[in-house]
Amino acid sequence: MTSVNLSRAPAAIIRRRLQLQPEFHAECSWLKSSSKHAPFTLSCQIRPKQLSQIAELRVTSLDASQASEKDISLVQTPHKVEVNEKIEESIEYVQNLLMTSGDGRISVSPYDTAVIALIKDLKGRDAPQFPSCLEWIAHHQLADGSWGDEFFCIYDRILNTLACVVALKSWNLQSDIIEKGVTYIKENVHKLKGANVEHRTAGFELVVPTFMQMATDLGIQGLPYDHPLIKEIADTKQQRLKEIPKDLVYQMPTNLLYSLEGLGDLEWERLLKLQSGNGSFLTSPSSTAAVLMHTKDEKCLKYIENALKNCDGGAPHTYPVDIFSRLWAIDRLQRLGISRFFQHEIKYFLDHIESVWEETGVFSGRYTKFSDIDDTSMGVRLLKMHGYDVDPNVLKHFKQQDGKFSCYIGQSVESASPMYNLYRAAQLRFPGEEVLEEATKFAFNFLQEMLVKDRLQERWVISDHLFDEIKLGLKMPWYATLPRVEAAYYLDHYAGSGDVWIGKSFYRMPEISNDTYKELAILDFNRCQTQHQLEWIQMQEWYDRCSLSEFGISKRELLRSYFLAAATIFEPERTQERLLWAKTRILSKMITSFVNISGTTLSLDYNFNGLDEIISANEDQGLAGTLLATFHQLLDGFDIYTLHQLKHVWSQWFMKVQQGEGSGGEDAVLLANTLNICAGLNEDVLSNNEYTALSTLTNKICNRLAQIQDNKILQVVDGSIKDKELEQDMQALVKLVLQENGGAVDRNIRHTFLSVSKTFYYDAYHDDETTDLHIFKVLFRPVV
């Protein structure tokens, strides 16, 4: 990994001019002014309308008067060395975590461990088949007498504690522990009344009555058998069982297979035909344990043995979680802005997902005959994004006759997070993918309705910022999202190890919710931001040196151009590309303005010297000379071959401008060509059919987006700009960029066109106040 070299001098400038406080919600001194301005303070809670009034102060606050180009990348400071070492250590930790993922890491479920502990020795001895489960239970009772996650939820605590008490009593072990557990249930059962039903564990109403009956049969004294809430749960179970067709459980894989231990008397042998390839029933250890108790099936036994291997003697609530853990890990790393450190691991993960992909979708673990829209949507999006061939029509399996999408067959109440992942997947749409169009409309409206009610309905995860995450996601579609803007927000939303997942019991997923991910992301974000601030100093110096204000270019416009570059290509080592991006945008505007003002109609061929001729013919030799010097400075330092190509693409662009055919689209293609050439593009590729198609589409898209922005005719429907032709063109561009076709154009080169197009979409979609806020978050707000 390339280290960032920063000198002491610009660091001192930054410290003087960026007096940044660590508290997010306290007043933070954002920028300390230069000598031209009084000290300036901005509250982090500032209203968007105030931001536009700040812009002119902000863009001059980091002035370039004391910095020079050579300051951009010099000696390391001790602090920087320490930061780089921490980053390297974190990267190594995460790499090891990912490459040793195996079946996926997941915390132990007291409930599932207790069910497995009930299994008697299969050879007929009066002993438990899995004594390690009893040992785990005995060693993991909490101080208050309960079992469960540290995040308190009465559903989780009551079920886990009841199951553990029954397991210990079935073997007449640990009477003192049993007594504490019984006391806990008796004293806390009343808390079920008024508890948040969205946090109710999966199958709660099915399995609690079953274990209460088992406790009765074992003669456990003191449990609240007759408590009204316990009776209410039993009544709910009976009502639900009446609604389930009697033979449905035997006919096809449904979510009923997840809670077989709570369904009562079953024809257990008939169920074996629905067994997954790994021996489980819907990846549930407790459900599989129930089948094992009644059938002594060897596959069930082998599955449970495997599930217990890596859980310190206990069992997780589901196993394996190889699909779930891999997909969500990739998603988190991407949104945190640190996926570039783990490209090898991500490819390894996605190769695995592709190898276990089914025509009907995927579930949390491989080898199941069941799928859900959550895992399948995440898989479709990530596979597609990385160039894998995946058919989005797999999502039709989750579409009901009324046009609604459901997480899985039999889901009674839909949750927000699966529908949000469906919405995110549907935004990566290729032409003709109608199911994704339908999914976009349904998911957007479904989520928007929840937001209007100011309350999300969520059954699968407890995350403090899920509401804000979804709200932002609907306001900022993928086309209008820039990588560093996404990372800046997700650093606020990502809870690290604080996220709690809901299954039959609460559980944690260290490959998904991991504090090291966040620590690394914060270190990386701040390191990149420091580099960006130094480059912004250099951009201001360039602005003053080249007298850009005389061409009508404001520092606000300069900042916006640099922000678009830095929010897209943000890596510290890509300084040259960022500065080239920002300066190309500005210089193209300067030249266009100059030519329009000069009113010349001089004809140009592809001779690059035509630009000199136009400028020299102008009466204002001072301004003309400045423009010419600025232009030549942009190209200074490139090798002869690169310079030749740059002159060619700039000449083509200038000819269009001189002939009155300049447009936002032409500017976009110029920018993409300039970036690609400087990245080492072979000249032959410029005339390649695929490259030409990318250029043509980008020109058309960005021209239309520039018109929308200039004419202020933005209309948004279902989260995207309302323009059917523009939408179709964006889909075509996304397909050209993302789909691997074995063509001559490198994937990174193709991505440049999409990146440039997304900045134009961003400009057209977001108003100035929103952009100001994003600039603040990406370039000036520290993350702590």
Swiss-Prot record:
The Asp-Xaa-Asp-Asp (DXDD) motif is important for the catalytic activity, presumably through binding to Mg(2+). Mg(2+) binds at residues 372, 374. GO terms for biological process: diterpenoid biosynthetic process; gibberellin biosynthetic process. Keywords: Chloroplast, Lyase, Magnesium, Metal-binding, Plastid, Transit peptide. Pfam families: Terpene_synth. This is Copal-8-ol diphosphate hydratase TPSSA9, chloroplastic. Coiled coil: none annotated. It comes from Salvia sclarea. It is found in: Plastid, Chloroplast. Escherichia coli expressing SsLPS and SsSCS from Salvia sclarea and CrtE from Pantoea agglomerans can produce sclareol in high-cell-density fermentation conditions, thus being an alternative, sustainable, and cost-efficient route to sclareol and other diterpene analogs. Pathway: Secondary metabolite biosynthesis; terpenoid biosynthesis.
